[in-house]
């Protein structure tokens, strides 16, 4: 929607439904989920002439706009989602735009160490993220906190992480590795503590406080013939102390 003063607003709701039957009436087996419900505001007149002139404000429950994956094998490179608010496309300088967001997620119904049991077996996880673009380069920085997650009983004496750090350096190429027409993306991700689930930010509360992981993702697409494309991809990951064993 475009207002009289030129400001634009967009409202989105996304539903997901899980069923395990082929029948036409599935109400008894259906699991309906509101996956996204959020609003965006852009082209605000009060931002004219500032670094926020082309920015978009948002709030609600959503999948982050700048997530990306290898869609044909259904594998995320980076996925950030939850309930939150933020701003996209701040023009910090020439060839430098930045996104700032805060997301919240929940860890529910986890076992608690007996000596720390206060009757609470859930907590909220908060993610503060900044996503920066310098031409084709992307630098993403994330900090995570989940109060009392360290009271989670992991089973063998390790302490669950109640905080974490995560970073991703990515390059979005506009050719097939410089060899021909097409595109490619490469990303190097590293996380510690709650950030050690490097492709799903803040999604795993079972990570230990000593957890660390580094992941490399590379993929590209190009045409071998007018109706024939090739799309190679490579994943590699090294991790330590992610789970209590």
Residue ranges and their predicted role:
Residues 50-129:
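Internal, well-ordered domain-core segments that constitute the primary functional module
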Residues 95, 133-148, 156-245:
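Detector for outer-membrane/organellar transmembrane beta-barrel domains
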Residues 22-29, 70-77, 111-119, 150-160, ...:
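Outer-membrane beta-barrel domain signature
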Residues 1-49, 98-100, 131:
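Beta-barrel outer-membrane channel/assembly domains of diderm bacteria
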Residues 1, 9, 35, 89, ...:
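Polar/charged side chains located within well-ordered beta-strands of beta-rich proteins
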Residues 10-17, 52, 57-64, 70-72, ...:
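Transmembrane beta-strand segments that form the barrel wall of outer-membrane beta-barrel proteins
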Residues 1-2, 37-41, 85-89, 126-132, ...:
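Residues on the lipid-exposed face of transmembrane beta-strands in outer-membrane beta-barrel proteins
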Residues 1, 30-35, 79-83, 120-126, ...:
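Residues that define the transmembrane beta-barrel architecture of outer-membrane proteins
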């Amino acid at each position: 929607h475009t207002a009289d003063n030129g400001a634009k607003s967009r409202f989105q709701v996304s539903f997901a439904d899980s069923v395990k039957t082929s029948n036409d009436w599935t109400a008894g087996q259906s699991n309906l989920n509101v996956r996204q419900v959020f609003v965006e505001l852009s082209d605000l007149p009060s931002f004219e002439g500032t670094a926020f002139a082309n920015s978009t404000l948002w709030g609600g429950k959503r999948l982050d706009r700048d997530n990306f994956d290898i869609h044909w094998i259904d594998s995320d490179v980076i996925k950030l989602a939850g309930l939150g608010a933020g701003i996209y496309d701040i023009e910090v300088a020439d060839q430098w735009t930045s996104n700032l967001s805060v997301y919240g997620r929940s860890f529910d119904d986890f076992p608690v160490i007996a000596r720390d049991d206060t009757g609470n077996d859930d907590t909220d996880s908060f993610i503060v993220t900044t996503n920066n673009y310098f031409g084709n380069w992307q630098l993403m920085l994330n900090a995570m906190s989940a109060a009392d997650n360290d009271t989670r009983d992991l089973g063998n004496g390790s302490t669950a992480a109640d905080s974490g750090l995560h970073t991703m350096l990515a390059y979005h190429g506009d050719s097939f590795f410089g060899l021909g027409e097409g595109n490619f993306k490469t990303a190097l991700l590293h996380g510690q503590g709650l950030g050690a689930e490097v492709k799903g930010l803040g999604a795993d509360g079972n990570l230990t406080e000593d957890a660390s992981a580094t992941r490399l993702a590379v993929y590209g697409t190009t045409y071998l013939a007018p109706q024939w494309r090739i799309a190679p991809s490579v994943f590699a990951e090294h991790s330590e102390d992610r789970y209590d064993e």
